[in-house]
């Protein structure tokens, strides 16, 4: 079985995600749903998130439920754990 941790964040919250990510563990991956509000200009992706076990998907607009649903749509593991930044 595989576990995917779905992390929802918005705008500059992407810069704090590395505090939630553990060292690589076999069978565990992370999907980060990075929401951009209308007035946000995306920044460079933090280098600490550029790993094989981390996938980042983006979403325009606002709304936590919308962001969570977006993460679920992109999830692929047997078990998913949804969390916010």
Regions found by a protein language model. Name each.
Residues 10-11, 46-51, 84:
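Anionic, Ser/Thr-rich low-complexity intrinsically disordered regions
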Residues 23-24, 35, 59, 67:
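Glutamine-centric residue-chemistry signal
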Residues 3-26, 40-43:
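Short, well-formed alpha-helical segments that are part of the catalytic scaffolds
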């Amino acid at each position: 079985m595989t576990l995917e941790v779905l992390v929802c964040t918005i705008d500059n919250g992407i810069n704090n995600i590395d505090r939630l990510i553990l060292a690589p563990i076999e069978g565990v991956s992370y999907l980060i749903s990075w929401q951009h509000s209308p007035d946000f200009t995306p920044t460079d992706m933090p280098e600490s998130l550029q790993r094989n076990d981390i996938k980042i998907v983006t979403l325009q607009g606002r709304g936590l439920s919308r962001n969570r649903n977006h993460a679920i749509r992109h999830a692929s593991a047997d078990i998913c754990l949804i969390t916010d930044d």
